[in-house]
């Protein structure tokens, strides 16, 4: 039997209660991850969020470098939840239940009482009966756990502080609710603190980074527009990424910068270091298991299989120039060139990424003239060209490769009018490309160890305390994979040797070399694609004023985050 009087004193529960006798026969042993706000550090919080992520997903489903959470269809109930046990300085403890299919909080246990958000459907209502089966009192709220409802009860997220202190207070509020010691508005705010500092931080490296900064400086502050729009857009971003064609979106997703200004995201590239986990939306098309050179085109009879769109994009490459059909003439064999990106609808810079792995402009195919290095790339009739000469793969690291030849698209010069060729892949800047409809470099600050910012200092680079809008801390991320100081976009972040410990410098972008091409990885590192080394704060000591390249080990001196 369940005692109901102490719960009904708030008028917060619904008539939807349930019995647990059947589930007590076989109690579920869900994984438990612990975190305490007592003496919490950046390191303890980072390890906690990493543990949450590792229990949420097996890593078996990874798309565009980003892990996908389990599909709820067919997921055994024994694998449906994980538990997060939180404690604070007051030695109060509560346990949150997270649904592994969306990383979201579904309920909470405090002592011998458990309470749950109102489920959206009967399936979820049945699933939560497997949680906290040994408590004496268990009830559901009359409200669900989505932000719209919680904000109606507790106020807008933009006015609710986050940080170690707010999490400490939230734990106490959740604990005392079980004894009628917490009012509903405070309870709703406390849930929003926990959800953002745990669920949203697990979903987004970006939000985890925001929380690390608050913990490091013992700061209490509300989330800015960049955080709130990411939270609101997680589902749409997950859908856009999973339904993208080789990383290009069928339609843009609008996000906001910290200052509230809006921008559109047209492709997955900038999101790889931002999103840690995606909600499952659809299964990859069966053809994605095959080489794009030989993949079959089959009807999609499975509604669960991702759409395979054919977006029309520009292809931006070296020095921010675009792939262009020379002279807007589409006769067979006309060379492809680099040219300043247009803003109109001229077809000679608009490329359709087709399901058959061709890249087409005005109905004709991007084609290699011969399968040997230094041969020109041309426009050609798709039906008369050799099939293998017209097929391309677009990798997440911004390589466009012709699978038949194993050669990659390249621009041997960064000047307008340069004719494009195929070359042996050395991951040079001259071989970096991004299919997108945003032709401008993405301007950002890059935050690293101790929440300090990467700063260009003449020909050197090191970490300094972050200063809002400081020009030396602004970086332009180019489509070709180069990272350039916003103050001087002719210079590039460069490693001029492929040796562990090499100091990274700011040098001319002219060589467009392998040492100037980088990739922001989903694990938080910035990888040099050619040598496999990552950016590293030497000895974890910013006072040395040296950023080096080093083999990956995953410590915080190798973790970087672009902030927008």
From Swiss-Prot:
Record: active site: 104, 147, 200, 203
Q: Which InterPro entries match?
A: Ribosome-inact_prot_sf, Ribosome_inactivat_1/2, Ribosome_inactivat_prot, Ribosome_inactivat_prot_CS, Ribosome_inactivat_prot_sub1, Ribosome_inactivat_prot_sub2, Ricin_B-like_lectins, Ricin_B_lectin
Q: Which domain of life is it from?
A: Eukaryota
Biological process (GO) annotations held by this record are: defense response; negative regulation of translation
Secretion signal span: 1-24
Glycosylated positions are: 34, 259, 397, 437
2-alpha repeat ranges are 450-485
**Matching PROSITE patterns:** RICIN_B_LECTIN, SHIGA_RICIN
**2-beta repeat coordinates:** 489-528
Q: Which residues form a coiled coil?
A: none
Please tell me where AMP binds in this chain. Answer: 104-105, 145-147
Residue sites binding beta-D-galactose 1 per the record: 32-34
Q: What are the Ricin B-type lectin domain coordinates in residue numbering?
A: 309-436, 439-563
The residue intervals holding the 1-beta repeats read 362-402
| Residues involved in beta-D-galactose 2 binding | 324-328, 337, 342, 348
Q: Which GO terms describe its cellular component?
A: endoplasmic reticulum
Cite the repeat ranges for 1-gamma. 405-437
> Which reaction does this chain catalyze?
Endohydrolysis of the N-glycosidic bond at one specific adenosine on the 28S rRNA
What are the 1-alpha repeat spans here? Answer: 319-361
Spans of repeat 2-gamma: 531-558
**Pfam families xrefs:** Ricin_B_lectin (PF00652), RIP (PF00161)
Q: Which Gene3D superfamilies match?
A: 2.80.10.50, Ricin (A subunit), domain 1 (3.40.420.10), Ricin (A Subunit), domain 2 (4.10.470.10)
What family is this protein classified in?
In the N-terminal section; belongs to the ribosome-inactivating protein family. Type 2 RIP subfamily.
Name of this protein: Agglutinin
Which organism is the protein's source? Answer: Ricinus communis
